[in-house]
Amino acid sequence: MQGRVMPSDYQRIEQAIHWITQHAHEQPELGDLADYLDLSPYHAQRLFTRWAGVSPKQFLQYLTVDFAKKLLDESQSVLSTSLEAGLSSPGRLHDQMINIEAVTPGEYKLKGKGLEIQYGFHETPFGECLVATTPRGICHLAFVSNTGRQAPLHQLKALWPRAQLNGHQKATAELVSRIFSLGPVHVNHRV
């Protein structure tokens, strides 16, 4: 009698990421993922978080916001974007975008019109970075390459062409220090 071959943790996470990506528009629950992986919800949560660095719910939220941004870029309304992304209301999209992007869906759709964004360049253990913030948290982070500061600054301006961009080293320095410290960081809860 041959026993059942158990997939490795790596294979399970690969399957989980693929499955969540394929079912993101359905907004699946942890129990659905656990059933697919043939694990308890507790073990699915722990395994995914350990290997992916975020919970399955957080990963799903990132996918949802990414999809919503594409729809908003195509001039879809916030309501239709929310529904097409599988969310029950625009309020859920609003909360997810604030949490992940530090902007509302409307601010994103209007490319920052009426929004003030502060930015600064700072040294990190990984090289120099540009960090940009709204009053709600980080809306952009990019590392400076060999080509210099112009590329990340140009990228920021392209992402937020209608925002008021203000270079402000001091305002962003403390946040960058917290991000690259050794403790837990919560960056999108008021800077």
Protein language model regions, located:
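Basic nucleic-acid-binding alpha-helical/helix-turn surface characteristic of O6-alkylguanine DNA
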Residues: 1-85, 91, 95, 101-191
